[in-house]
């Protein structure tokens, strides 16, 4: 500590960004972990080092001042910084013991109430980071769910050791924990957009609220948290989890919509739709993840082998071709990490808005619709629009979930895209699916397409580096509507048992024919989002990803990408017999006819204004 008192931080002769991050012992103030041990030891040996007390405490104060001066205020860094400052404050004497008046009370007040350029007060951070209506933190799910635990742990430390009750002062800390189940797919793993490794819900936030409630003998809050913790457990019954999850949930501060038919791991569907707003986000346009039969079959690609510091992250994993989205002219992109590119909600059913971000909980929704047999009561949908900044292209995506039976259902995906000022070259519709086998067929004859090796979809021509990561490419011109099957074979008997006896899961996609369209079958780099996933069907991180691309030459607004996706398995075959398309009378609308094996036909119309009729 004597050395810290006399030490100065390194000086960057280039006056670069690193100068604003550097700590006394590390190159980033959030990694000053030595503070944890030193602040625990100092009170124990304080009486033994009385002669050095002044210089030791001067060192601690210098350390705190450097953390206040350097760092990042607008994300989880601020919280890590505040944690170190509070730990230092708690070993200092009262303010009057120091000539500058900066002691225990000064630093505690600074963390809670004061603001500087690189150290916001916890109050300001909470106001900035949480959406007041949806209660979501403004980072990708992996980071957001972790922050709930960190904030809770920090708040408990302040409450226990300094008598500052942040939970009472900021009720959103508890509300956000209560809402955290909205991140879950039916398999009880979190959505995977941005820099996320999906897994079961991090219950750190719940545990910290429980700790607080127990200390304050708040029986109601203890009961609420115990019920929530039980409900988000992987094997919790539907009656529990469906009281915490909505049919439609919209988080405007991360530009994300979750749409569910229910939370049955095996039989329900969920679509996760996101743009790029907030921290730890990717350049993904309007991206989509699709769930079925126990897995997110159509996932994001993940972070990258070396997380977000590697070249593969910079060139591929954070870019649009790694996501289920549409790339314009081969160049669509924008800054990643702290991103400002949100979508706008055009239409939805049930309706969600910034002011009313959640529809009824699934338990209520099912009670209100179980007696209705009309098709419209089996459909939920969301339409969002997005301005792709690199090419100034207007994009609109309609995603719908349609239940066909207690065990089955399908998705509709209608993606429109055009450059505002014209001059469209290409629009590339990307879809990635788990699995080891991919079959692309003519939807009418059922015969495989005659696909030839190609070097299209390349960086050559001034396109994104990400195109260079796509390989084993084959293509064919679209003559008729097509049918594509992505087959996932489960190889481990223990996983077969965990997945209700399924050995083979198939995602079937039907895509509407359009002129000037080329279909590609290819492979992409391994999915590194699910490398930590339990019950993997195969070693996901060791195998390339099955990749489907439809390239529309010219604009894709009046020639939209229209697809139907149905998940099925060897133990639960699909309900769809065939899919046809028709031209509705409404200008710009898309018509879809889904014929089921039970003889019924479902007729749906996706209008240009974003609404869906049946």
Model segments located where?
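Aromatic-lined, polymer-binding surfaces characteristic
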Residues: 1-174
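Surface-exposed intrinsically disordered loops and tails
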Residues: 6-16, 104-132, 136-138, 339, ...
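Carbohydrate-active enzyme catalytic cores, enriched for enzymes
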Residues: 142-297, 585-586, 593-600, 605-614
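Acidic, glycine-rich loop-and-strand cores that form catalytic or ligand-binding grooves
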Residues: 216-247, 492-531
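Catalytic and substrate-binding regions of extracellular carbohydrate-active enzymes
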Residues: 222-450, 555-557, 567-569, 584
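Short, hydrophobic/aromatic-enriched beta-strand segments in well-ordered soluble domains
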Residues: 429-431, 506-509, 518-536, 559-570
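Polysaccharide-binding surfaces and accessory modules of carbohydrate-active proteins
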Residues: 430-517
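Non-catalytic terminal regions with compositionally biased, polar/charged low complexity
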Residues: 535-614
